[in-house]
Amino acid sequence: MASSDASAAGATSTYLVVYKDKTSTSGAGKAVSAAGGQLVATYAPISVVVARSASADFAVRMRAVKGVEGAVATTRFASAVDGGAVGADASATGDTTTDAPSVPANGVAGLNDSLSGLQWDMTQIKVGEAHAVSTGSPTVLVGDIDTGLDYTHPDLAPNVDAAASVNCVSGVPVAGVVAAMDDNGHGTHTAGTIAAAANGIGMVGVAPSVKIAGIKAGNAAGFFFPEAVVCSFMWAADHGVDVTNNSYFADPWLFNCRNDAEQRAIWTAERRAIKYAQSKGVLVVAAEGNQADDLSHPTVDATSPDDTTPVTRDISNACAVVPTEVPGVVGVSATGNKQMKSFYSSYGISEVDVAAPGGDSILQQTAAAPNGRVLSTWPASLLTSTCLPARRVIDASGAAYCYQQGTSMASPHAAGVAALIASVTGKTGGALSAALQDAVNPIPCPTDVSAYAFFPALDGGAAQTCEGTLTQNSWFGAGEIDALKAVG
């Protein structure tokens, strides 16, 4: 748990201060104050604190403190810490009518909600058949570390764990579903894929009987800054979360280079928080990314820092994407309805553990997936402002849904399958990870990758290539997840 020490009003920058591993942070308040800052949160189990300061030399002064191994400003966008009051606007805005696509008959492969005929992704990984065995257990809790979730959505409300939900955007946990309300849409989409209820409304999630907590780390603009990521994993560890879904990379650096002092501090703090969660039995599942980068052989980062003007720089394997490249994290690449790798999905022989449906609007449009994307829940209040008109779907009940694509959509399928496994076996942590990677259908590297020539890596422009064997390769890992195998 974090302790909130001050409101830090008027501060211009947020800082992570990383003490040497297992060093006491009991003197952090005095040290931060002496350096011209205010202590915002203390994460004693991992020897990390969050501070705010307007002093230009704050980081330099903190690095000189005995026991401190790193201090770094995490963003130029200071996030307000206001003593616990986090505003949320859940009011409807605008007209949500749309020319929705025609809906095939429901009841496809055992999925029986009103929009189930549009769920090609669930059919592909045999979710309906799996539900004949188990729909998950309400004793299993998935923490969706994302932009929050719309706890009022009728397809999510039955399964939301209000007490385990939290807003971590500022680096200080503010508990409750109101604080965790989604102001972007992304988190509501991933939450629906994991745990939308089988209630006759809209769609069905992979594990519609488990509980889900909205752990809000991403702000309205979709940034996931280090203090929020640290807070989120510490919260998950201490609040009974079994599986976390992580459909993001931690900003502002796509690749955090451990040979750079500032980026090393960010990597260290985030890695410690993830490791702490893993030590409590939490399985961490994460998206590989949408840059078509080979994460096992990185050479260029043209994306970072993304909170200002990116600067192209040469990188190596000393640089890693958080959270997907943190040891023990299950990395997920994306597939489309033809069970090919999605054109945008990043990959890597040492990085991808499993593949899951994320959609592909260019190479993999089919009769079942006419626009190639994945349908899931969306806040009605944000539908007209954050979901393009052609992607909007309104259920007969008035509930809102949106089509999206990305490894962000793939990861929650894997997290949901992990939740099913946990429900039927009681497995946690490493044992759960191994079981998830066994519940797959292997997909070999394609013999011809020319279809991907139009979309080289966004970082460096390298052509996409696949390496490895049938049972472990850089595009699909062990294979595409299979929910029926998971519960069989």
Please state what every model-predicted region is.
Residues A8, G29-S116, N337-K338:
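Autoinhibitory propeptides
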Residues L16-S24:
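Short, surface-exposed ligand-recognition loops at beta-strand->loop->(often short) alpha-helix junctions
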Residues D146, V282, T309-L420, E480-K485:
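Extracellular S/T/G-rich loop segment that most often corresponds to the catalytic His/Ser-adjacent loop
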Residues L39-A41, V204, G240-Y248, A400-Y401, ...:
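C-terminal subdomain of the subtilisin-like protease fold in secreted/lumenal serine endopeptidases
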Residues L16-V17, V40-A41, V49-V50, L141-I145, ...:
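Structural recognition of the beta-strand scaffold that forms the well-ordered cores
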Residues M1-S3:
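Secretory targeting and sorting signals
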Residues D95, A100-K211, G218, F223, ...:
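Active-site core segment of subtilase-fold serine proteases
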Residues E262-L283, A318-G328:
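Catalytic-core regions built around general acid/base machinery
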